[in-house]
């Protein structure tokens, strides 16, 4: 069975910044075809749940709403996720969209106003740079 890295919040784990989950309706179908490997890069990077929301700034730093630079946590979580992908031989990931760690293609712009911009989250970018195909949850039909 093929392996799929998946954002833990999409599996129903309450690990999002707000302490909630974001269950993906297609999970039961995915389980029929993939061995799901849950990850939460933000938690794996040492951030608590719940936590202040954070966004990637124009200079690449990740800063939370309180003004704290949490870039190191995001990088650590991304590296831990990449290590899991390598160890498991996983070349495919389904991640939570718009997230500063997992977002692919569109993320919040750093102004903490809910404005989206083109870009990738820290973890999504690292996975893609290392040959892992990343899809957002709205692309689940591509699996």
Please describe what each predicted stretch is:
Residues 1-5:
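Extreme N-terminal starter segment of soluble prokaryotic enzymes
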Residues 9, 96-99, 139:
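Short, well-ordered beta-to-alpha junction loops that form the rim of enzyme active sites
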Residues 12, 45-47, 100-103:
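Short, active-site-adjacent cap segments at secondary-structure transitions
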Residues 12-19:
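Short N-terminal binding/cap micro-motifs at the start of the first secondary-structure element
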Residues 22-63:
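Short, surface-exposed acidic-centric catalytic microdomains
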Residues 35, 118-142:
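Short, flexible loop segments at boundaries between secondary-structure elements
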Residues 68-85:
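Glycine-rich anion/phosphate-binding loops
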Residues 102-123:
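Short Gly/Thr/Asp-enriched flexible loops that form oxyanion-binding sites at enzyme active sites
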């Amino acid at each position: 069975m093929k392996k799929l890295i998946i954002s833990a919040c999409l599996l129903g784990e309450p690990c999002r910044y707000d302490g909630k989950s974001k269950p993906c309706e297609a999970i039961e179908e995915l389980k029929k075809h993939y061995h799901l490997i849950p990850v939460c890069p933000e938690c794996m990077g040492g951030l608590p749940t719940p936590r202040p929301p954070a966004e990637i700034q124009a200079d690449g730093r990740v800063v939370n709403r309180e003004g704290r630079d949490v870039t190191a946590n995001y990088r650590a979580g991304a590296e831990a996720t990449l290590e899991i992908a390598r160890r498991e031989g996983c070349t495919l990931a389904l991640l939570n969209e718009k997230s500063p760690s997992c977002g692919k293609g569109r993320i919040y712009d750093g102004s903490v106003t809910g404005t989206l911009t083109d870009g990738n989250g820290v973890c999504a970018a690292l996975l893609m740079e290392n040959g892992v195909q990343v899809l957002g949850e709205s692309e689940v039909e591509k699996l």
